[in-house]
Amino acid sequence: MTDIPELVPLIKKNISLNVPPSISKIVAQDLDWTTLQSTPSSLRAKAFSFEVIDLLLAVDCVYHPSLVGRLVDTMRYLATPGKTTVVVVVELRAEDVVREFLEAWLQSDPRWEIWSIGEGRLDSAYALWVGRLKEEMQ
């Protein structure tokens, strides 16, 4: 799990209170999308090393246009083709920002497969998408 540095201690506390250590390996660490985006791609692996992520869950991260590109770049960087499932849950505050996010996500890599989930089952104020990067063909 990642967030801004100030919130990581709270995340760690929530993990320790709610997830038995034997169940799974959940790690909380800070990740600044702005720093990631501004780091040259040739240096990213050294500056931002993560193990392969099974599930990338982005909740309530789409709310301001200035963050859309940063979030999409971060999701693309963290997602391993064929291995990482990305789940994005959005509160539908600003239709234009949500549209901008979806367009940016789809355009960030042609291998993304993205599905809308729960239409008609979620509160109308929320939307949920699941995405995966297809593995490269050999």
Task: Enumerate the predicted regions with their spans.
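S-adenosylmethionine-dependent methyltransferases
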Residues: 1-138
